[in-house]
Amino acid sequence: MTLFTENDLLNNSYKSIQKSYHFSENQAAKNILEQAYKNYDKNKIYDIFLSHSFLDARKILGLKNYIEGLGYSVYVDWIEDKQLDRSKVSKETAGILRERMQSCKSLFFAISENSDHSLWMPWELGYFDGIKQKVAILPVLKSSYDDSYNGQEYLGLYPYVAKGTIINSTQEEIWIHSSQKQYVRFRNWLQQN
């Protein structure tokens, strides 16, 4: 198993953009996001609320595509709720995000070099942990050689996300680690109390 790397996520993002080869890269990305926005259903239950820094938008698009390719549904605020103003903290935005988190089974906290610049990530983590306790840290690293991760400060309290194949199979899966040697498939973790 390995952790997620920036290059893997950017390549995955590029692959989805490349499918719209007759558009420029920016136009293709915009078309993909607009299609996702049109398909948004406020009554839908998502497997994952993806908490992240907007500065990582391209990587997050790649991560969303990867996870959805495994059969899970992912809520990303700037895709599903383009009207939200993320540049400042407001009661209106907080209210909408609370509703969306209520519609999600878990929260993945995508930590990167840009996470410190997010106004919303710490609040999303605390709120979701308080209502559902299904929170996992998803490290986005420059490089990854294994599946070990030690979160700093309060992030070390939560399990973390890695990717890998199922034993005796080529099928990819998301794994939730409580330590490097203790882990469970994401779908099984969702069903645990």
From Swiss-Prot:
Keywords from the named record: Hydrolase, NAD
EC number of the protein: 3.2.2.-
Q: Which reaction does it catalyse?
A: NAD(+) = 3'cADPR + nicotinamide + H(+)
EC class of this enzyme? Answer: hydrolase
Q: Does the keyword Hydrolase apply?
A: yes
Q: Which domain of life is it from?
A: Bacteria
InterPro entries hit by this protein:
Toll_tir_struct_dom_sf
Looking up Gene3D superfamilies in the UniProt record yields: Toll/interleukin-1 receptor homology (TIR) domain
GO molecular function ontology, one term from the record: hydrolase activity
Q: Does the entry feature the keyword Hydrolase, yes or no?
A: yes
Role description: TIR-like domain-containing component of the Thoeris antiviral defense system, composed of ThsA and ThsB and ThsB'. In the presence of NAD(+) produces a signaling molecule that activates cognate ThsA (AC J8G6Z1) to hydrolyze NAD(+). The signaling molecule is a cyclic ADP-D-ribose isomer and may be 3' cyclic ADP-D-ribose (3'cADPR); it is not 2'cADPR.
Task: Describe its assembly.
Answer: Homodimer.
According to UniProt, the name of this protein is Probable 3' cyclic ADP-D-ribose synthase ThsB'
Gene that encodes the chain: thsB'
